[in-house]
Amino acid sequence: MKKLLLLTAIAGVFAFSNVKAQDAAMSGPKLGVGVEFGFPMGDFGDIYNLSVGGSLLYQHPIANKLNFTANAGYLNFTGKDYELAGVTVAAKDLGVIPVKAGLRYFLAENFFVNGEVGAVFGTKDGFGTRFAYAPGLGVEFPVADKSSIELGARYEGWTKGDGSVTPQTIGLRLAWNFGL
C-alpha cells in the first residue's frame, strides 16, 4: 500500500511539473458572451426589481496587464407596484441597451478592476439616452488555452444631466470568454 501511495505521488509530480498558470490578462483579443443581473438601488429600486439580460464584451490588450474593452447588451428591469401620493402605481418593465467602452487592468494573474463609460438607451418612450459609468472588479478562471469563465461585479449609474433621478444598480456578470 505504501509503495502504491509513493508511486502515485511521484506520478503526480511528473504529471504536473510542466503545467503553467494561464494568464488571462495577455492571452490576446477575446470576446465574452455573458448573462447579466442588476439589482436596482435608491429611488430606482423603489420602482424596479431585479434585471436580467445579456451582453457581449470585447477585450483587446493594449499594454502589460491592461486591456481595452467594448461592451454592448440588453437588460430588462421588471416593474413593481409603488406608492405615489397615496396611490398605488404599477411600474411597467423597462428595457435598456447599454453601450460602453473602457479599460480592464489585471491586478494579479486573473483578478481585474475595470472602468467603463458610454451611453444607455431606453427601449420605451420617456427614458431617452443617458450617460453611463460603471466601475467594477472580477476574476477570470482559465478553462482552456484560449477560454475562460468570468465572474464580475460592478456599480453602474446612468445620468441625464438634467437633475432627474440617476438610476443606480449593482450588476453581476457571468460570462464565457474565448480567444479570437
Model-based region annotation:
Residues M26, T78-D81, Y133-L180:
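Predominantly the C-terminal beta-signal and adjacent terminal strand-loop region
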Residues F39-I47, G73-I97, F121-F127, T159-I170:
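Flexible, solvent-exposed loop segments that connect beta-strands
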Residues L31-V35, A70-A72, A101-L103, V113-G115, ...:
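Membrane-embedded beta-strand positions of outer-membrane beta-barrel proteins
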Residues M1-G28, L180:
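Cleavable N-terminal export/targeting peptides
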Residues K20-T69, L75, P167-L180:
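Short glycine/proline- and aromatic-enriched beta-strand/turn motifs that initiate or cap beta-hairpins
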Residues F37, H60-I62, Y74-N76, L107, ...:
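Short beta-strand segments enriched in hydrophobic/aromatic residues
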Residues P98-G136:
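Surface-exposed, polar helix/loop patches in the mature regions of secreted/periplasmic/lumenal proteins
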Residues N64-F68, N110-V113, V143-I149, L180:
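Repeated loop/turn-to-beta-strand initiation elements of outer-membrane beta-barrel proteins
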